[in-house]
Amino acid sequence: MTASPRTILIDGYNLSLQKGTGVATYARNLSKEIGRIGHEVAVLYGNRSNMSADPLLREVSFFDTDAQRHPGKWGNALEQCLYALRGPLGQTARPVPTTGKVVTRTFASRLPHYDRVFNAPDVFRRAQSAFKLWGQPSAIKPPEMPDLAHWTYPMPLRLAGRPNIYTLHDMVPLRLPYTTLDDKRAYLRLIRKLDRSADHFVTVSECSKRDLVDIAGIAPERITNTYQSVDIPAALRDKPEDQVAREVEGFADLGYRDYLLFWGSIEPKKNIGRLLEAYLASQVDVPLLVIGAQAWKSEQELQVLNQKGKLGEKARKRVVQLPYVPFPMLVTLIRGARGVLFPSLYEGFGLPALEAMLLGTPVLCSDTASLPEIAGEAALMVDPYDTAAICQGIRTLCADADLRAELSRRGLIQAQKFAPEAYRARLDELYRRFL
């Protein structure tokens, strides 16, 4: 698409996590679209690998995450202090060879598109330590300097001597402070510092843009809403229905279109506690499949399942829990569900709603924050704070086949507003302003 290819650096902060996050999905999709625009993609990781002078050992060590060095408690504390003191000097990133000698197909679905990989051991934590002491983002200095950095998350790092763009997905730590563990003072300090030093900000919805202006005080002309996109391979998206049905039954022992689905972290923001109460009260005749790793306050969110006695036993029989499934199987489970339930308290975008719509699965979601903007008229909207409303929504979704068919039809149309081509064009227009 572009006449003069450049190199754009993105961070691998969330990409290195073994279990997926929404920001990791964002970063992977971003890397693919940068490549499709015609630019080269460089990814900065912070693996604790052996940055040997031997290229082969450096490549092997980078991918051998289980063998990477992790200091003990006191060693880690001393190390963080030393790097905090050296903060103003910045950090050097070294190239990681990617020759193909290491077989990476095992985790191919977690890898971004990339042309180059850089690594600076523990760079993200070290930058946080330095920022606490100095109040300045640490400079990162790769040997082959990219032309621009697009950080996928607010972090105290900058690419020295080049434009720096930061994606701020939402203001949840400040909007709903009781739903996250973030140090709110440190978070606000970082956002305000980035407002003074960043070249530009990206966000993912008009709702989030308003929050950045109203809460963080960032000037609207310094924020571009690119929205997000989902890139689901055709082989998964177009898999025959009978094959989807067999895989759903074999993997989860569930019938095709005979279960409801939620996926996401088990944390207060996702509202899983009210969802479980509403689902159990609805007495619908299909099970609920919950996919998600237990996070902060998960015990509180899952207390209806963890209670003792007959009530807890009955609830556990109706709710199937899985901590994590790989992306290809997640796509199959979305396609096989009767409906997707996503009554989150607050979302900067709401990727699960878009993924479900793209796959033709009816969606029940919140009528708050960005979700009305993303789902439009293609979802059954409920008040996420009203358990009775969620309960009635579940009953309606399960009982009304005509409604499900209509939501599926509308969802496929609505999802096209966030097609990769549209997302790519918005990114291209943004990057042209800084390259």
Task: Write out the residue ranges for each language-model feature.
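Carbohydrate transferase catalytic cores enriched for Leloir-type hexosyltransferases
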Residues: 1-435
